[in-house]
């Protein structure tokens, strides 16, 4: 029951994300311990990134910096893995002329906040529909 509830919540969260992001194509693939999805085109994130180069300087490690919007072109396959209390996001982005970098280990808080926002909006829509009827 918990797994179906989690999967339903995840599907609803990603549908909200897809609805709020222009030119976003999303396909979900469920495995034993992860949800893998593919993103194409452009994605609008509700946060900025603070980035640091890795030791080999081939990629940059980026984490949340603020609540501002960041728009990124997605260049490669994206993988989200939920484990315990963290949500790990692995993908390569190309933001403007800064070049590509990888984003990993984004805290689950941000996904939780977006999920709650989606459920809040859904609740508001239901209340309005009931009042309208």
Curated annotation (Swiss-Prot):
The domain of life is Eukaryota
- Organism of this sequence: Saccharomyces cerevisiae (strain ATCC 204508 / S288c) (Baker's yeast)
In its UniProt entry, what is this protein called?
Answer: Putative uncharacterized protein YBR277C
One further remark on this entry is: Partially overlaps DPB3.
């Amino acid at each position: 029951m918990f797994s179906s509830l989690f999967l339903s919540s995840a599907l609803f969260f990603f549908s909200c994300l897809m609805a709020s992001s222009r030119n976003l194509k999303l396909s979900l693939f469920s495995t034993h311990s992860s949800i893998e999805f593919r993103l194409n085109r452009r994605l609008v994130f509700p946060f900025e990134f603070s980035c640091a180069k890795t030791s080999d300087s081939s990629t940059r490690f980026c984490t949340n910096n603020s609540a501002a919007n960041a728009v990124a072109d997605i260049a490669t396959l994206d993988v989200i893995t939920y484990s315990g209390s963290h949500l790990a996001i692995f993908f390569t982005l190309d933001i403007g002329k800064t070049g590509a970098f990888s984003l990993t280990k984004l805290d689950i808080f941000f996904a939780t906040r977006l999920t709650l926002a989606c459920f809040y909006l859904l609740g508001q829509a239901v209340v309005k529909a009931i009042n309208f009827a």
